[in-house]
Design a protein with these regions (language model features):
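Accessory, non-ATPase domains that flank or precede helicase/AAA+ motor cores in DNA-metabolism machines
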Residues: 2-396, 408-424, 706, 733, ...
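Inter-lobe coupling/hinge segments of SF2-like helicase ATPases
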Residues: 234-240, 244-247, 256-690, 717-722, ...
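Non-catalytic terminal extensions of ATP-dependent helicases
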Residues: 8-140, 185-186, 196-200, 254-262, ...
Length: 774
């Protein structure tokens, strides 16, 4: 069996290891014996929650040769669905009379290259997810149905083979019989072929009326591949010594797999390194894939790439229409797009001639999908690069502890950019204790003075608070009522524009109350601050200065966001106000002061990654200051200014702080020195969620005793957020020192879970390498 085949069957059929382990694909057969068939069996992955493939016979009417990676329309229960072919075989557990035939072959060739196909198989195995849903995730929405890849050409195919009965029925219709023979002999013909052969439209229509011939829409010819640039761009910047070393080192393996961690302080010129490496790949006719964590980064990134390169650049992210995403997917697959830039799902972009994959801001948790197929785009990018045999670059000023440990283990190559590029100097950091201060909408007088000083000098200021909305809480001063989401165990956030109460967890929107629903008092007040409330305060405090709020609420319009970016890049005095979105890779050379209003949230997080993420956010947002010759300063407000974590961040580098955290993780045997998996249930009642997890826990006991798996377990327990979107949530956390052991354990566990009868309305999921345990 070759590597393009999925060696899987029936219930949960895969097991796999991370990059340093070989992927083992096991064939798990049901208890009944397999039956040898004289003809071919086609195994199809269908989008369903079942971890298995399904056996079909080839189409009744001979069509194009069927290959792995092609879409087919098949009967599934009482409906027809679109699946993806994964392999052909000679045996099945089903008797011949129980097998159904494939209805239609939808593609002329596989939609996935061999390398991408194998990456998807690895992903289904590693993340313990149904293979049919994995393939569906990898396809644009329009290709998840019967839509052809590119609709342009009408063709005609025979529906029923020309046998004796058909031949007899057409004995008096010689033209129809002759045309039917032509179409059958060539499999499919277009209208020009029919016309040139001397047949009329009337004859063709008669065959279609008799259901002997059917019309299909198929893909047009491929677009021409991009033309490689013949010279370097005039916009190419000179490199410093560290950048030169990075470029030279990576180019040594420019035509083979290697994973590099480009660890550069903010403003060190990582993007220029990317671009010069891309220039080399484009000159050799190879495509490049660039992943960014947020849609908000895409306009700025795309603009810089299009200014720099004359070759076509396409964009792929969830903000595009289905038609636009399919168009970008086609250009990438055909090789007419030189550079594909996108967010998480762009890791599945097909590349005709791949040359390099870049993951910018590799530490960002946005690269991990939080529902459905819970994959990490960063980790998939590394595995895909390995399958494609191309280099992959993970860039960050605050690398994840996982990537740093992979460097220490010699799995990744560590390249450092320790100085800012050009004349830019690192900003100065100041920690301000506000525990005894009287604040005005979250600002100390000391901070307001510094803001005014920078604005008077015609500079720009960035104010950071990781809380969107107007205020995080609406409460009644008379009885203590608090506005809570009736679908979640969470408070509703007050929003001023548009006015209302919103749940940031499930999306519930309610009208803004004018009186307390408990005691009817009108004595309601908002507590806490969010970006909208701060925006109003800053506009009143600095009435002549533009205040640009950049958060998930304000940038829903791409045009509005691009307008704000243009205004910022003019380097006129303004105040940027935003959430975590502003910390990610933006280059704003006019900013000389960064203000962090509240740095305390990550200090007391229930998540073991809380301190790492807090350090990354503060370091990243601090890096927005001083990116030109004007210098910069960072003011961090805290009620716990003496806390060891904050003191370490201010007095040392991120690298030193990360080393400290790695030692803590090693001592506590937490990732990256172990592997976690999260089993979660959602049900209408908490009892049902916990009871089902208890059944899973009993299976785990049995596996641990009989198979000698060393797996630590926490739970079953209610999730920290017990109710979300109307469902009660329970969880069971698994931990193992060995990925090999964890994968084999999950493989067998998922088999047995699928054999359980889950209560109506209950859903269960497995999250391998979870980044959110809340």
């Amino acid at each position: 069996m070759n590597e393009r085949q999925v060696v899987c069957y029936d219930v949960c059929i895969y097991t796999a290891m991370l990059s340093r382990f070989k992927v083992f694909l096991k064939k798990s057969m049901p208890l009944n014996e397999t039956i040898k068939h004289h003809g071919l069996i086609i195994r199809v992955a269908i989008p369903s929650p079942l971890r298995r493939v399904f056996d079909y016979l080839p189409p009744i009417v001979e069509q194009l040769s069927i290959k792995p990676g092609m879409r087919v329309r098949v009967p599934f229960g009482k409906r027809e669905v679109v699946g993806v072919v994964v392999e052909s075989a000679q045996d099945s557990t089903l008797l011949p009379n129980r097998l159904k035939s494939i209805g239609t072959v939808l593609d002329r060739e596989p939609l996935f290259s061999s390398a991408l196909f194998r990456t998807l198989l690895w992903a289904a195995a590693y993340y313990q997810h149904p293979i049919g849903e994995v393939f569906q995730t990898a396809l644009p929405v329009k290709l998840r149905s019967t839509e052809p890849v590119k609709v342009d050409t009408t063709v005609y195919r025979v529906l029923i083979p020309l046998d004796g009965d058909i031949s007899t029925s057409l004995k008096q219709a010689k033209k129809q019989k002759s045309l039917l023979e032509l179409i059958e002999s060539e499999f499919e013909v277009n209208e020009n072929r029919i016309k040139n052969a001397g047949y009329s439209r009337r004859t063709l229509n008669q065959l279609m009326e008799k259901n002997l011939v059917k019309r299909y829409m198929v893909a047009s010819e491929r677009a021409a591949k991009f033309k490689p640039p013949t010279s370097a761009s005039e916009l190419q910047l000179p490199l410093n010594d560290a950048q030169k070393v990075a470029v030279k080192t990576i180019l040594k393996s420019s035509d083979s797999y290697a994973c590099y961690l480009l660890d550069g302080v903010t403003g060190s010129g990582k993007t220029e390194v990317y671009m010069q490496l891309i220039q080399h790949q484009l000159a050799n006719g190879r495509q490049c894939l660039v992943l960014v964590p947020e849609i908000g980064l895409t306009p700025q990134t795309v603009s810089r790439f299009r200014e720099r390169f004359t070759c076509p650049v396409v964009v792929m992210h969830s903000g595009l229409s289905d038609a636009a995403r399919l168009d970008a997917w086609n250009h990438s697959r055909e090789g007419s797009a030189a550079i594909t830039i996108g967010t998480r799902s762009a890791v599945f972009a097909p590349l005709a001639n791949p040359g390099m994959i870049i993951v910018d801001e590799e530490h960002d948790t946005s690269f991990k999908q939080q529902d459905g197929f819970r994959y990490s785009a960063r980790d998939l990018a590394v595995m895909r690069a390995k399958k494609e045999n191309v280099p992959v670059i993970l860039g960050s000023a605050t690398p994840s502890l996982e990537s740093l440990q992979n460097c220490k283990a010699n799995k990744f190559k560590h390249l450092r950019l320790g100085e800012r590029a050009g004349v830019a100097q690192p900003p100065t950091l100041e920690l301000v204790d506000i525990s005894q201060s009287i604040l005005e909408s979250g600002f100390s007088e000391q901070l307001l003075f510094k803001i005014q000083k920078q604005l008077n000098a015609n500079n720009q200021v960035l104010v950071f608070i990781n809380r969107r909305g107007f205020a995080p809480m609406l409460t009644c001063n008379s009885c203590g009522w608090i506005a809570e989401c009736n679908q979640c165990i969470a408070q509703l956030t007050v929003h001023a524009k548009p006015p209302g109460l919103r749940c940031h967890h499930c999306g519930t929107i309610e009208k803004l109350s004018t009186s307390c629903p408990t005691c009817n008092s009108s004595n309601l007040t908002t507590l806490g601050i969010g970006t909208q409330k701060i925006e109003l305060f800053l506009k009143k405090r600095f009435p002549l200065i533009p205040v640009l709020r950049i958060d998930g609420d304000s940038i829903r319009s791409r045009k509005r966001f691009e307008t704000m970016l243009e205004q910022i890049n003019r380097r006129e005095p303004c105040i940027l106000l935003g959430t975590q979105m502003l910390t990610k890779g933006h280059h704003f050379p006019g900013i000389t002061l960064v203000a962090v209003l509240d740095a305390d949230a990550g200090l007391f997080s229930a998540d073991f990654r809380g301190q790492e993420q807090m350090a990354q956010i503060i370091t990243q947002v601090s890096g927005r200051a001083g990116r030109s010759d004007r210098g910069g300063q960072v003011v961090i407000q805290s009620r716990h200014a003496g806390h060891q974590t904050l003191q370490s961040l201010v007095q040392s580098t991120y690298a030193e702080f990360a080393d400290f955290l790695l030692k803590e993780r090693k001592n506590s045997a937490m990732p990256p020195f172990s592997q976690l998996a999260l089993l979660r249930t959602e049900a209408k009642e908490m009892k049902a969620a916990i009871d089902f997890l208890s059944s899973i826990n009993s299976i785990s006991d049995d596996l641990s005793i009989n198979k000698q798996f060393e797996i630590d377990r926490i739970g079953p327990i209610p999730a920290p957020m017990e109710k979300r979107a109307g469902k009660f949530r329970g969880q069971l956390i698994l931990k193992s020192a060995s990925r090999l052991v964890m994968q084999e354990f999950l493989f067998q566990l998922c088999q047995r879970i699928e054999a359980l009868r889950a209560p109506a309305g209950l859903r269960w999921s497995v999250d391998v390498d979870p980044v959110d345990l809340i």
